[in-house]
Amino acid sequence: MDAFDVIKTPIVSEKTMKLIEEENRLVFYVERKATKADIRAAIKELFDAEVADINTSITPKGKKKAYITLKSEYNAGEVAASLGIY
């Protein structure tokens, strides 16, 4: 699966901004069929960042969210800034 097909869009809200600042986490809507391995590879390819942990959930509307924790040597704020959301 192509990295641009896996990662759909970042989620920007007060909660996600707090996660970026305090927990070094990013939140994206992802392709519903994407596995955690697909998401990990897409983050590595698109942002050159190593992933420490991924949690996923499917919303009642059927969209899949990925909560991505980056390793401590990478800054989620810098990745968010490169996306123009921070």
UniProtKB/Swiss-Prot annotation:
Belongs to the universal ribosomal protein uL23 family. SUPFAM superfamilies: Ribosomal proteins S24e, L23 and L15e. GO terms for cellular component: ribonucleoprotein complex; ribosome. NCBIfam families: PRK14548.1, uL23_arch. GO terms for biological process: translation. The gene is rpl23. Binds to 23S rRNA. One of the proteins that surrounds the polypeptide exit tunnel on the outside of the ribosome. InterPro entries: Nucleotide-bd_a/b_plait_sf, Ribosomal_uL23, Ribosomal_uL23-like, Ribosomal_uL23/eL15/eS24_sf, Ribosomal_uL23_CS. It comes from Methanococcus maripaludis (strain C7 / ATCC BAA-1331). Keywords: Ribonucleoprotein, Ribosomal protein, RNA-binding, rRNA-binding. This is Large ribosomal subunit protein uL23. Signal peptide: none annotated. Part of the 50S ribosomal subunit. Contacts protein L29.
